[in-house]
From Swiss-Prot:
Organism annotation: Cyanothece sp. (strain PCC 7425 / ATCC 29141)
Protein name per its UniProtKB record: 4-diphosphocytidyl-2-C-methyl-D-erythritol kinase
Active site: K11, D150
Catalytic activity field: 4-CDP-2-C-methyl-D-erythritol + ATP = 4-CDP-2-C-methyl-D-erythritol 2-phosphate + ADP + H(+)
Gene3D superfamilies per the UniProt record, alphabetical: 3.30.230.10, GHMP kinase, C-terminal domain (3.30.70.890)
UniProt enzyme class: transferase
Amino acid sequence: MRAYTLIAPAKINLFLQIIGDHLQQDQPTGYHNLVMVLQSVSLSDELQLRPLSGEARSLRLDPPILLHCDHPQVPLDQTNLVYRAAALMWQKFPGQAGVEITLHKRIPIGAGLAGGSTDAAAVLVGLNLMWELGLTQLELQELGSQLGADVPFCIRGGTSLAVGRGDQLSPLPDLEGIYVVLGKYHDLSVSTPWAYQTYRQQFQASYAQTLEEQEQRRQQGGSGALLKAIAHRDGGQIGQLLHNDLEKVVLPAYPRVEYLRQQFANQSPLGTMMSGSGPTVFALADSAAAAEEIYAGVRGAIADPYLDLWICQLCNQGIQVQPL
């Protein structure tokens, strides 16, 4: 049985519009109806999957899953999405060999970059190969949807339009080659449930109330112009059309995030925005040199030892596999 290394890219949002409450037969489900453009970036975690060693098998783990991580704040039990992904596969395909997972964490935790989701996606892809299950990408995405709304996207990666709860995906043309500078304070996190609940409290009166109204709102929204810019790979237009409704509630509540966004904007990028519910802010650049200038400008403007910055690129794929 082979062992595998998997590269799991982070994800940012280029567009996030809240249409209203997610409805089934005009009844709210408790989620939001969203229109998003999701984008993989080259900042990645790395996972190694291998069959359990004899020593590990002697521990009689149930399920037979052993997780290691080089980040001290990452839990190693069922509270970790990586562990839950492996447990889900074991539940669906019992009797397979146990697995030992080593996670090398590079994507910051609590950053809104789908770090947990992309790691879970890597486990699904890796176990499908290791156990020789022969599952299709669509079947893996259906399993992933049981773990979280971002997991199906992270399996395929690249650039996608996501609607509904965010799990109805349509692939878009690749944007590989555009650079992105990411910024996050490592002592700061934003609760995603808080962000959406606060948005609902403040803006529910403006929600589209029926499925028909929501579809009209979606078609009239700004995503169409962004999709056209993506089709033409027009980085300047893409940068100008970035949009995130959650900025309306997160930025006023988190002045450091708002200040970081302003400092990114001061560097004249193609565009800048908070990703998802934050607190990560990003700026797009059309070259490595421009990205370096943005990085240096923000670093010089914010003398905060808790601010982490990364330069990476938009990338055109999700989970990448390398046999060990």
